[in-house]
Swiss-Prot record:
Protein name, UniProt field: Ras-related protein Rab-7a
Modified residues (Cysteine methyl ester): 207
Catalytic activity: GTP + H2O = GDP + phosphate + H(+)
GO biological process entries: early endosome to late endosome transport; endosome to lysosome transport; endosome to plasma membrane protein transport; lipid catabolic process; lipophagy; phagosome acidification; phagosome-lysosome fusion
Organism whose genome encodes this protein: Pongo abelii
Length: 207
């Protein structure tokens, strides 16, 4: 039995400040929730080993500051991502409206090989609160218009749908990682023009 190499999946969580990105990550990785809000400065990450379809993978989940002054974290931060998670607060409509700009920001910075099919997952967080202002159908319609992005309604506080959402994130990230590996195994052929071919045949003929 051949041993499979370890797979590291890079997942980036984006969204406005205060939507619960850190809380979702902590709930998923550490099964903990804190009511004390502490803004993330720059970026931080946690890792978790998970089974995806009988394969053990390590997820490296990057949490980002939502403040605009941290929005340009640099190309190196985004590059190599296998999945991008977009988070909004269902009680704050403005955080939903900015999903477009977060998605665009990621695609510009990460410049994935196949942007049309790059895996995103959207989380509508804080469904445990009563003053909901973003309807489920509205969020689903946005996701459908963006190549049918998977959508989950979550509560980091009550641990609602967090595990299920990250299972989908891991599965989609693994699929993306596998496709990139296959693509890299078959480099693009180098095309020679007529002059190059003539030059090559002349150099190989030592008569």
């Amino acid at each position: 039995m051949t041993s499979r190499k370890k797979v590291l999946l890079k997942v980036i969580i984006l969204g406005d400040s205060g939507v619960g990105k850190t809380s979702l990550m902590n709930q998923y990785v550490n099964k903990k929730f804190s009511n004390q809000y502490k803004a993330t400065i720059g970026a931080d990450f946690l890792t978790k080993e998970v089974m995806v379809d009988d394969r053990l993978v390590t997820m490296q989940i990057w949490d980002t500051a939502g403040q605009e002054r941290f929005q340009s974290l640099g190309v190196a931060f985004y590059r190599g991502a296998d999945c991008c998670v977009l988070v909004f607060d269902v009680t704050a409509p403005n955080t939903f409206k900015t999903l477009d700009s977060w998605r665009d920001e990621f695609l510009i910075q990460a410049s994935p090989r196949d942007p049309e099919n790059f895996p995103f997952v959207v989380l509508g967080n804080k469904i445990d609160l009563e003053n909901r202002q973003v309807a489920t159908k509205r969020a689903q319609a946005w996701c459908y218009s963006k190549n049918n992005i998977p959508y989950f309604e979550t509560s980091a506080k009550e641990a609602i749908n967090v595990e299920q959402a990250f299972q989908t994130i891991a599965r989609n990230a693994l699929k993306q990682e596998t496709e990139v590996e296959l693509y890299n195994e078959f480099p693009k052929p180098i095309k020679l023009d007529k002059n190059d071919r003539a030059k090559a045949s002349a150099e190989s003929c030592s008569c």
